[in-house]
Amino acid sequence: MLLLWQSRIMPGSEANIYITMTEYLLLLIGTVLVNNFVLVKFLGLCPFMGVSKKLETAIGMGLATTFVLTLASVCAYLVESYVLRPLGIEYLRTMSFILVIAVVVQFTEMVVHKTSPTLYRLLGIFLPLITTNCAVLGVALLNINENHNFIQSIIYGFGAAVGFSLVLILFASMRERIHVADVPAPFKGASIAMITAGLMSLAFMGFTGLVKL
């Protein structure tokens, strides 16, 4: 109703721009909060559990994943649109996307190693493991399945990365507080971490219906 009202009071071109920008904003919000890739789609759980013990490491991992996810989404879209479809080799999509992600991760690893050796050491094995992070491959494949255009692919990849980073940083903050709390012995370690992740997932259920994609 709001979009219809706006389209009536605005000139045609301005109304179209407004509607398009609104759709992009809703796509971003929906990807970050409503359809969070970790808590709703259960993708990227390995780094979510493995790199969330320290807040500093979680922030670094979130930044690296944001860069990789966004760039990989763009590269995957270009490969799909200008290589796989024109040549009729869509059956090589998964393998091609894995190669694209591996190249992007290698580039990211080189950048982090040069710019922040301390962060590179803190991330350790988890930085190259972004290659096998199912969230990165999942975003690339879902972009194709949803028939997103170039801009939508960028927004979808960026939104997925922001959603991943958000829950990773929140989870790391809570785990640091839990680490110094008086937790009963049977719940220490992975047990309390899984319970905390479950409570976070329930909290994010409150965003259900906020955006209908």
Curated annotation (Swiss-Prot):
The chain crosses the membrane at residues 25-45, 59-79, 87-107, 122-142, 154-174, 191-211. It comes from the Bacteria. InterPro entries: Ion_transpt_RnfA/RsxA, NqrDE/RnfAE, NqrDE/RnfAE_oxidrdctase. Its main location: membrane. It holds the Pfam family Rnf-Nqr. Part of a membrane-bound complex that couples electron transfer with translocation of ions across the membrane. This is Ion-translocating oxidoreductase complex subunit A.
